[in-house]
């Protein structure tokens, strides 16, 4: 009987396990995660626990190979779309009110955008942050009923690829254990980037460096962007320059809240969107992210930038006219308000001018915006060097029974991460 060990209970690992049990996989499935099950996972633990960061996110499932990673490079366009649709179907399947899922499917780029920005058009399902928690509980119950074994609040301390052994210990270091695997699915997510780097260094895995992805979380009253929201709920404005490209990312509307993420002890920002009308605040927030190519040691560079924009043990907020917003719980967003951008521009080492220009051009496209906006600094997507894998099943070229998925393979977004896990499970079922 085969043993499948999945490191990380994020979107990739959970979709892999679901694909296996849906098809009556006869082996054992073990999932190890540093966080908690969905019944015990607190709201502030946004990176670990059942469904990982994706399960505590804005709740939007994009359906396109233009964004989110290199899925179509691995499997081709048609297969990539099929895999992502399976992920969407899983979220719908465990949703307590699937009829409330909203599909945005823009088809034509509006003329008022074209002089200043490109607009990427693709379908997007809006699940809702508040419903993700209930989805997680139903999904977890299903996997438990199918015999999947979870090891909560446990951290993997070592993987021996030669002996197919995973060693893990409880986060309070009071107990430890070993699991042997026939197939290992490595999906540690953002919170495991350091461990991923250690593993790749220990086993001298061939890798490809990924560019810097850093920027700000922009927030303004929704009314200024309504004419674009009517075209595309999760709009993606973008522009490409020689060594820097910019895009708006993870747009939240109607009941939109800025969320704090803590990684490596530093604060950064993201956004959530609720579906329940009682949370409506008529705000919009989205990331303005730069992808910067050609930076030496991009991961280290990103870490240093984030450290340099911390003040009073949190990130920073700047606005010409506004003050920081509150969370959906009515608590002020953790941030330090500053009255000018000098310290931010210094930390970004000359690259902040691209964000300045992006905001200036938004004020031209949306003339009512003027100074009615604010930015939370930083927003960052840490991307460790990407290991080289076999495209057919995402297995390491040196260790064919070890599969990298999700953020560990530079996926960005729920749909692509889930598709990684689904693909690996399909290949396991074939063998």
Walk through the language-model features, giving the residues of each:
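Dinucleotide-binding Rossmann-like beta1-alpha1 core, especially the glycine-rich loop
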Residues: 49-102
